[in-house]
Regions:
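Extracellular glycan-recognition regions
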Residues: 18-231
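Sec-dependent N-terminal signal peptides
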Residues: 4-13
Length: 231
C-alpha cells in the first residue's frame, strides 16, 4: 500500500511529491492538513478528505472528450470520524483558467487550497452527486467569473437538479460514471442513466478533469479517457 499524507506547507509542491505508481498521474488540491491519499490493490485510489479536496488528473483533454471511471463513497460501521458520512461524489471536467490561458488549474492550487468557493475562478462543468449531506444532485457550468469567489450573486446557476432518492448516493456502492463533451453536448451518465444532457452554446473545448469531494472517504478506480481533436 502506498500512502501520501498531506500538510498545508507542502500543498504548493504536491504535484512533485506524488511519486508512487498511479499517483504519478494525479495532483492533489487539499484544504486540510489531515487529508490522505492512498493507493490500494487493483489500482484503487483511496481518499480521506476531512475538508474540501480536488484530485486533478495531470493531462489536459481537448476536443470531443469522453471520460470514464468507477467511484464510491465508503461509510464504515463504528467509525465516529466526521468524514465517515455519505455525501459528495463530485467532479469537474473540461476545467481551465479562462483568464490565464498559459496556466493550468494546478498552478492555482496555492490560491484555491481546495476551498470550494475558490473554484468559481475556473471555467468548467460541475456535477455534485449526493451533495449537501446527500440531499441534492446538481449540475452547473462555471464561467470563470472570479467575483463569484466572494459574491454569491455571481455564482453559476443550477442547470439541473435532482432530490429524489434514486438520484442520491448509496453507501459503499461502486458507480460507473461517464462524462462527455461532444460537439457542445455535455452529458453525465451514471450506471447507464443519462442524468445530465446539456447543449452548451459556448462549449469548453479543452481542460482538465478533477475528482471532487469534501468531508468524506471516497475511492476511485479504472479511470480512462479519449479525445478526438477538433479541426
Amino acid at each position: 500500500m502506498k500512502k501520501l499524507l498531506l500538510s498545508l506547507f507542502i500543498t504548493t509542491l504536491l504535484p512533485n511529491l506524488l511519486k508512487a505508481d498511479i499517483l504519478d498521474h494525479w495532483s492533489v488540491e487539499a484544504e486540510s492538513p489531515e487529508t490522505s491519499v492512498t493507493t490500494l490493490p487493483d489500482s484503487i485510489i483511496d481518499i480521506v478528505a476531512p475538508k474540501g479536496l480536488t484530485l486533478w488528473y495531470n493531462e489536459r483533454m481537448e476536443g470531443n472528450t469522453i471520460i470514464e471511471y468507477d467511484a464510491r463513497i465508503v461509510v464504515e460501521d463504528n467509525n465516529s470520524e466526521p468524514w465517515n458520512r455519505l455525501s459528495d461524489l463530485n467532479c469537474f471536467w473540461m476545467a481551465s483558467d479562462s483568464h490565464k490561458e498559459s496556466r493550468s488549474p494546478f498552478e492555482g492550487i496555492p490560491e484555491r487550497q481546495g476551498i470550494f468557493v475558490r473554484q468559481y475562478a475556473l471555467s468548467l462543468y460541475y456535477l455534485g452527486f449526493g451533495g449537501n449531506h446527500n440531499t441534492t444532485t446538481r449540475f452547473r457550468r462555471y464561467t470563470g467569473d472570479e467575483r463569484g469567489v466572494k459574491n454569491a450573486d455571481y455564482r453559476p446557476a443550477i442547470l439541473i437538479e435532482y432530490t429524489d432518492s434514486a438520484h442520491l448516493l448509496k453507501k459503499n456502492y461502486w458507480y460507473h460514471i461517464r462524462l462527455e463533451q461532444i460537439d457542445g453536448c455535455v452529458r453525465y451518465i451514471i450506471d447507464g442513466e443519462v442524468i445530465v444532457e446539456y447543449q452548451d452554446p459556448t462549449p469548453l473545448p479543452r481542460g482538465y478533469f478533477g475528482f471532487r469531494t469534501t468531508l468524506s472517504h471516497a475511492q476511485i478506480r479504472r479511470f480512462t479517457y479519449t479525445c478526438t481533436p477538433l479541426f
